[in-house]
């Protein structure tokens, strides 16, 4: 089994995790990033997705992050998330409803140019990506 290392995961409003893990999988900007003890130092941006922490006993904890940064050192990793939540805390029904509304707003052709919709299009797409990532974190947590 891998050597444990210290991990801190914080968002502007709270600290979500502080403890030892043997592995982290995080959603880096250009793909999933797997971290073990003694990883080479790096800093990367995170995109919306799930952070999976594997503890020494094999238990996996799943968190959702909306984006942020990860700093990796040989014996510790710090994740600074824009927004974050434990997958167990997320309300699946509320997220599904919000996702359906966002998809409808993005896809609904009404035949007229809707300048308000055009201004908010990018924001709606970002929200849709975040909602989809939250649902994926919930599903992973249930496994």
From Swiss-Prot:
Keywords: ATP synthesis, Cell inner membrane, Cell membrane, CF(1), Hydrogen ion transport, Ion transport, Membrane, Transport. The keyword Cytoplasm does not apply. GO terms for molecular function: ATP binding; proton-transporting ATP synthase activity, rotational mechanism. CDD domains: F1-ATPase_delta. It holds the Pfam family ATP-synt_DE_N. GO terms for cellular component: plasma membrane; proton-transporting ATP synthase complex. InterPro entries: ATP_F1_dsu/esu_C_sf, ATP_synth_F1_dsu/esu, ATP_synth_F1_dsu/esu_N, ATPsynth_dsu/esu_N. It is found in: Cell inner membrane. Its main location: membrane. It comes from the Bacteria. The keyword Cell inner membrane applies. It is a peripheral membrane protein. Gene3D superfamilies: ATP synthase delta/epsilon subunit, C-terminal domain, F0F1 ATP synthase delta/epsilon subunit, N-terminal. Produces ATP from ADP in the presence of a proton gradient across the membrane. Belongs to the ATPase epsilon chain family. F-type ATPases have 2 components, CF(1) - the catalytic core - and CF(0) - the membrane proton channel. CF(1) has five subunits: alpha(3), beta(3), gamma(1), delta(1), epsilon(1). CF(0) has three main subunits: a, b and c. This is ATP synthase epsilon chain. The lineage of its organism: Bacteria, Pseudomonadati, Pseudomonadota, Gammaproteobacteria, Cardiobacteriales.
């Amino acid at each position: 089994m891998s050597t444990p290392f210290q991990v801190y995961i914080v968002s502007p409003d709270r600290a979500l995790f502080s403890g030892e893990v043997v592995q982290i999988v995080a959603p880096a900007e250009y793909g999933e990033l797997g971290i073990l003890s003694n990883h080479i130092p790096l800093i990367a941006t995170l995109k919306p997705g799930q952070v999976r922490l594997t503890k020494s006993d094999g238990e996996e904890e799943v968190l959702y992050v909306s984006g942020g940064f990860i700093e990796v050192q040989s014996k510790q990793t710090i994740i600074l998330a824009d927004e974050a939540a434990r997958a167990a805390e997320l309300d699946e029904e509320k997220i599904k409803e919000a996702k359906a509304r966002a998809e409808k707003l993005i896809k609904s052709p009404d035949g007229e140019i809707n300048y308000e919709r055009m201004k908010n299009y990018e924001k709606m797409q970002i929200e849709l990506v975040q909602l989809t990532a939250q649902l994926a974190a919930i599903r992973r947590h249930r496994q």
